[in-house]
């Protein structure tokens, strides 16, 4: 399990992970690593939270929130944000399914993708600022938001099909078992109960689960399945929805 954790950390983040820590792990085994996603999200969110807490007293809440969001983007190399932009470019092109998938594969940023990035990043800065002004424990909130975003993404993997013939998302989509899904969601719920005392965190997680489940069904109907881009979009939107649900 430790090898899977380090392999997944290297896969979905830009944190330096020595190759020997995940050596001997076959790429086809990566689907089992979905259960580590909430823990990896918690780690990344905690780093972003530490940046916010460290800068808050020095430059104020809005700028601290801005640098926190920037840190989270840098930690993943914009991996999930790129998926969000590509998904919006394809979906909102209002073309045929095959053409949508072609647009999503295009490396160029379109208008809809650009607008999606602006909206999500700005919304995160504003919501983080508002939560801090309301006295929310930000280190825990940010750690849990990133854990929730990655944990609920399993809903776009279990019993879904891959919309393309090949790609990185094919490692997870349709390969995750019911047991792995339950463990992933259960671990995410446990983290919510621990990090956010009371029912506030769990309630926010339930809202996030419902929203991402609906998103997955809509994407399935539109694209005929999921892709790595839609997983990235689900993670980014999951983080934002969880933070909004905490308000």
From Swiss-Prot:
The keyword Transcription does not apply. Keywords: Cell inner membrane, Cell membrane, Cobalamin biosynthesis, Magnesium, Membrane, Transferase, Transmembrane, Transmembrane helix. GO terms for biological process: cobalamin biosynthetic process. It is found in: Cell inner membrane. The chain crosses the membrane at residues 34-54, 59-79, 113-133, 138-158, 171-193, 194-214. Its EC number is 2.7.8.26. One of its GO terms (molecular function) is cobalamin 5'-phosphate synthase activity. It is a multi-pass membrane protein. It catalyses: alpha-ribazole + adenosylcob(III)inamide-GDP = adenosylcob(III)alamin + GMP + H(+); alpha-ribazole 5'-phosphate + adenosylcob(III)inamide-GDP = adenosylcob(III)alamin 5'-phosphate + GMP + H(+). Its cofactor is Mg(2+). Joins adenosylcobinamide-GDP and alpha-ribazole to generate adenosylcobalamin (Ado-cobalamin). Also synthesizes adenosylcobalamin 5'-phosphate from adenosylcobinamide-GDP and alpha-ribazole 5'-phosphate. This is Adenosylcobinamide-GDP ribazoletransferase. The gene is cobS.
């Amino acid at each position: 399990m430790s090898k899977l954790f380090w392999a997944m950390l290297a896969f979905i983040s830009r944190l330096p992970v020595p190759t020997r820590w995940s050596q001997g792990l076959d790429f086809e085994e990566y689907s089992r690593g979905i259960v580590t996603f909430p823990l990896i999200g918690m780690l990344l969110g905690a780093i972003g939270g530490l940046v916010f807490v460290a800068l808050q007293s020095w430059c104020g809440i809005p700028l601290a929130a801005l640098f926190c969001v920037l840190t989270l983007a840098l930690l993943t190399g914009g991996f999930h944000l790129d998926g969000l932009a590509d998904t919006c470019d394809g979906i909102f092109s209002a073309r045929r399914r095959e053409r949508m998938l072609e647009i999503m594969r295009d490396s160029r940023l379109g208008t809809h993708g650009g607008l999606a990035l602006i909206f999500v990043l700005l919304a995160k800065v504003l919501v983080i600022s508002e939560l801090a002004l309301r006295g929310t424990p930000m280190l825990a909130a940010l750690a849990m938001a990133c854990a929730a975003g990655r944990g609920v993404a399993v809903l776009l993997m279990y019993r879904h099909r891959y919309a393309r013939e090949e790609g990185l998302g094919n490692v997870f989509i349709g390969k995750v078992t019911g047991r792995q899904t339950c463990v992933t969601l259960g671990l995410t719920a446990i983290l919510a109960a621990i990090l956010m005392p009371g029912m506030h965190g769990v309630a926010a997680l339930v809202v996030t689960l419902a929203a991402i489940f609906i998103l997955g069904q809509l994407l399935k109907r539109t694209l005929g399945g999921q892709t790595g881009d839609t997983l990235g979009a689900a993670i980014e939107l999951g983080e934002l929805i969880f933070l909004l649900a905490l308000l």
